[in-house]
Amino acid sequence: MHTDEKIYEGKAKVLYPTDDPQVFQVHFKDDATAFNAQKRGAIAGKGRINCTISAHLFQMLAKAGIANHFLSQPAPDQMLVRAVQIIPVEVVVRNIAAGSLCQQTGLPLGTPLKKPLVEFYYKNDDLGDPLLTRERLLLLELATAAEIEQLEALARQINEHLIVFFQQCGITLVDFKLEFGRDQNQHILLADEISPDTCRLWNQSETDPEQRVMDKDRFRRDLGNVESAYEQVMARVLAQPL
């Protein structure tokens, strides 16, 4: 049971304490933002959908040996998680060229990458979440050299599991972002969420570059049918056994 006191409120979630100092309750919101919150709106049912998808994927990854913060889902839009100190770094994994990678490199949209690309972004809205080199991660003391290696290794492992899982759902995992945190013993755990908000997902049964989109790009690019796309992802995810 959480109190009314918030530990933290972000764009998509609110974090509350519980009776156990090592357990937090996360409330997933319907609020939607894009372009570092320059575009704002709401997606009906998004909190429930993203929480449910994340819970299923966290449990799947835990069974595959990926330690994460998920404990339980006491309500459709609520999750109990292990308390972690979030590392202020977004770890982005790219399998296919899209989004900023196309804008910054000139690669055509949809170009398969020969090897998954792992990138680190500073989780800092004031600075616009800039791309960081490993040297800058060390300079800012955001993580140790050993932790950086661990984050990349974990991201690649998670990518392998998610590619297979989404393939079984008839969905192509284009790219996605991850967040990690340190628990009370300084162990690194996968945290935050894995959902259409944080993944770029393409429907394999669609060839049209707009119709195939099943993620927050529908909101970013005003493609419409955002709620139905999220619902479809959830239905396909839940159809896969843990």
Curated annotation (Swiss-Prot):
Disulfides per UniProt: none
Enzyme class: ligase
Pfam families: SAICAR_synt
One GO term (biological process): cobalamin biosynthetic process
Record keywords, A-Z: ATP-binding, Ligase, Nucleotide-binding, Purine biosynthesis
Substrates-to-products reaction catalysed: 5-amino-1-(5-phospho-D-ribosyl)imidazole-4-carboxylate + L-aspartate + ATP = (2S)-2-[5-amino-1-(5-phospho-beta-D-ribosyl)imidazole-4-carboxamido]succinate + ADP + phosphate + 2 H(+)
Organism domain of life: Bacteria
Pathway info: Purine metabolism; IMP biosynthesis via de novo pathway; 5-amino-1-(5-phospho-D-ribosyl)imidazole-4-carboxamide from 5-amino-1-(5-phospho-D-ribosyl)imidazole-4-carboxylate: step 1/2
EC number: 6.3.2.6
GO molecular function terms noted in the UniProt entry: ATP binding; phosphoribosylaminoimidazolesuccinocarboxamide synthase activity
NCBIfam families from the UniProt entry: purC
Family in the record: Belongs to the SAICAR synthetase family.
PANTHER family, alphabetized: MULTIFUNCTIONAL PROTEIN ADE2 (PTHR43599), SI:DKEY-6E2.2 (PTHR43599:SF3)
Protein name in UniProt: Phosphoribosylaminoimidazole-succinocarboxamide synthase
Organism of this sequence: Cyanothece sp. (strain PCC 7425 / ATCC 29141)
Taxonomy of the source species: Bacteria, Bacillati, Cyanobacteriota, Cyanophyceae, Gomontiellales
Gene name tied to this protein: purC
